[in-house]
Amino acid sequence: MRISLACLAALCALPAGVMAQDASVHDKPAVRGSIIANLLQDHDNPFLLYPYESNYLLYTWTSDLNKEAIRSYDWAENARKDEVKFQLSLAFPLWRGILGDNSLLGASYTQKSWWQLSNSKESAPFRETNYEPQLFLGFATDYQFAGWTLRDIEMGYNHDSNGRSDPTSRSWNRLYARLMAQNGNWLVEVKPWYVVGSTDDNPDITKYMGYYRLKVGYQLGEAILSAQGQYNWNTGYGGAELGVSYPITKHVRAYTQIYSGYGESLIDYNFNQTRVGVGLMLNDLF
């Protein structure tokens, strides 16, 4: 489906210079579910943008709100458990064919926000926003083993922060790899990482976030079922997200999401909660 600028504006307010009016978004992959194969498709429009992670908008409710982490905000005690959660995730190919026809140097930007929209008493503040740019080298492959086809190999640098100052600043930097394989209607992706640089704002983040993310997807008719999570086997801490989406128009899907555990956001990396959300999605795993 093609993501219109109007939809993106509804998800997140970005500087007009970044999202120029003649920019368009391409999200019809050459290989179903393959981010790299999608980015390798060549088009004449230099402002063409591609989806990276899923793009969605949800109304959510959480079992417990982490007021302790935001106690420095003057509205913390009045923070509400219901929030609008949305994710904007786009990618751009910087250099196709950098190491052969099926390779590219690319960049992506993912932003996830938790918005206290119903909290009119406190002027509807954003409780948390996570900014996640990446620079990566990607390869589209067709290696086969035991019925599975390895589609994506990606290696890169990831920065993830909430853009806050002390005492609510949270950030970490990682070197990562991403491998995605398919078998029929199944998709499996693993993304291990290695933390680099300072983690002074959150020195124990790997205790709760671990060293990898595992994602599994299955297409059942027109519905897409997804599960993803991170886990530290040494500490027993982690978090998981379950999702179901179904098309309601050509370009929009109904989406239900459940997150349970630690690390839904950076400010909540060491906080355990369960969040349920319903809303709309522009692109899923397939």
Swiss-Prot record:
Residues 21-49, 97-102, 146-147, 184-185, 221-222, 248-252, 284-286 are periplasmic. Belongs to the phospholipase A1 family. The active site is at 159 (proton acceptor), 161 (nucleophile). It is an enzyme of class 3 (hydrolase). NCBIfam families: PRK10763.1. It comes from Klebsiella pneumoniae. This is Phospholipase A1. It catalyses: a 1,2-diacyl-sn-glycero-3-phosphocholine + H2O = a 2-acyl-sn-glycero-3-phosphocholine + a fatty acid + H(+); a 1,2-diacyl-sn-glycero-3-phosphocholine + H2O = a 1-acyl-sn-glycero-3-phosphocholine + a fatty acid + H(+). Homodimer; dimerization is reversible, and the dimeric form is the active one. It is a multi-pass membrane protein. One of its GO terms (biological process) is lipid catabolic process. SUPFAM superfamilies: Outer membrane phospholipase A (OMPLA) (SSF56931). Its main location: membrane. Pfam families: PLA1 (PF02253).
